[in-house]
Regions:
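Single, function-defining residue in the core of a domain
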Residues: 2-3, 7, 12-19, 64, ...
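Positively charged, low-complexity intrinsically disordered regions
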Residues: 38, 58, 227-230
Length: 338
């Protein structure tokens, strides 16, 4: 009887493979599975973010002081000519427009243990579902609030998501947010005054330390937020806004905002150790299933890394330890002539 092939078999392949994450490579190294069976399974099953949420929820260590992080990443498909769901879009890593598949991700951070978990994601494919990245964020937000009911205090997100619609949704739930503003965001110190770019504001020495109250264009009259000027380098200054009007420290705002880089760490790890962006299948369904499996693999690696206090990279590299010892003891290909 043939072994039943499931997505967990594919996950196992992604977990142990070091460089090549193609179905062909999987089939070449499996004694029981052919490429056709693997490809057929990946085109027929329909994995969704629900699988990730269920797996991640059992691993979460929750905190009332928790953080919810939203951001997006692009799976590089610049050499693709026929993969469905690939579109030209801005890549923050590349600092330019590339061909790829966009993913909006959500990460939960426990500041008490300094641990984090990916808890949800959405694939950005407006030609198929008509949804913007902000629509996907709000879908995940509603799931967090009404379905998962995860405890947290603060939301961190990129300037792309600093829209009134998102900010008001967070405020309605009594949560705080910190997010950078684009340098051309229109702002004023008085709702009756003329608006100007946020990067044109003048700052007193005291305001540089404690922030200033501002009004964003299109927000309701009297709706004030706290703005902080964070000097990142000689060539970069961030303007971070929060609805926590009690916040009076630029240094603390910098520390709060720095937590957002946990989601960048997740993106980097997922791409480097799970083959997240390595799928070459043309079918959008196979691509979606591959992404879902890669997410599950990261959750598993993260679980082991937290239990052993190792990094995900060390865990992945450790799979080669036995191979290296054996090859050094008795190499398959010798450096020396017989």
């Amino acid at each position: 009887m043939k072994k039943k092939l499931t997505h967990l078999d594919y996950c196992q392949f992604l977990l142990v493979s070091q460089v090549n994450y193609t179905q062909t490579y999987f089939a070449d190294h499996s004694e029981l599975l052919s490429h056709d069976r693997i490809n057929r399974m990946m085109r027929q099953i329909k994995l969704t973010p629900q699988e990730l949420r269920q797996r991640a929820r059992s691993e979460l260590r929750l905190s009332e002081n928790g953080y919810i992080l939203f951001d997006d990443t692009v799976l590089d498909k610049r050499h693709s000519t026929a993969i469905e769901s690939v579109r030209r879009q801005w890549s923050g890593n590349e600092k330019r427009v590339i061909k790829g598949i966009g993913i909006v991700t959500c990460v939960y951070v426990n500041p008490d243990t300094e641990q984090f978990w990916v808890i949800d994601y959405r694939i950005f494919d407006p030609d198929r579902d008509g949804k913007s990245k902000i629509d996907h964020l709000l879908d995940m937000w509603r799931t967090i609030i009404h379905v998962e009911q995860i405890p947290f205090r603060t939301v961190l997100m990129d300037s792309w998501y600093a829209s009134m619609k998102v900010m008001k949704a967070i405020e309605r739930e009594g949560k705080f947010y910190y997010c950078p503003l684009k340098s051309n965001r229109q702002i004023t110190l008085d709702a009756e005054a003329t608006y100007s770019r946020v990067d044109s504001l003048t700052w007193t020495p005291e305001e540089l330390q404690t922030g200033k109250l501002v009004h964003l264009k299109k927000f309701p009259k009297g709706h004030l937020l706290k703005l902080f000027r964070l000097v990142v380098s000689t060539h970069r200054t961030d303007y971070v806004v929060t609805n926590d009007l009690s916040q009076d420290s630029t240094d603390d705002t910098r520390d709060q905002s720095a937590i957002r880089w946990k989601i960048e760490q997740f993106h980097r790890e997922a791409k480097q150790v799970t083959g997240l962006e390595a799928c070459q299948c043309r079918s959008q369904r196979a691509q979606r299933n591959h992404i879902a499996c890669a997410m599950l693999v990261w959750v598993r690696l993260n679980q082991i890394a937290q239990a052993t206090s190792d990094s995900i990279y060390l865990l992945k590299q450790g799979l080669l330890d036995d191979y290296m010892r054996e090859q050094l003891r008795c190499p398959s290909i010798s450096m020396f002539s017989a």
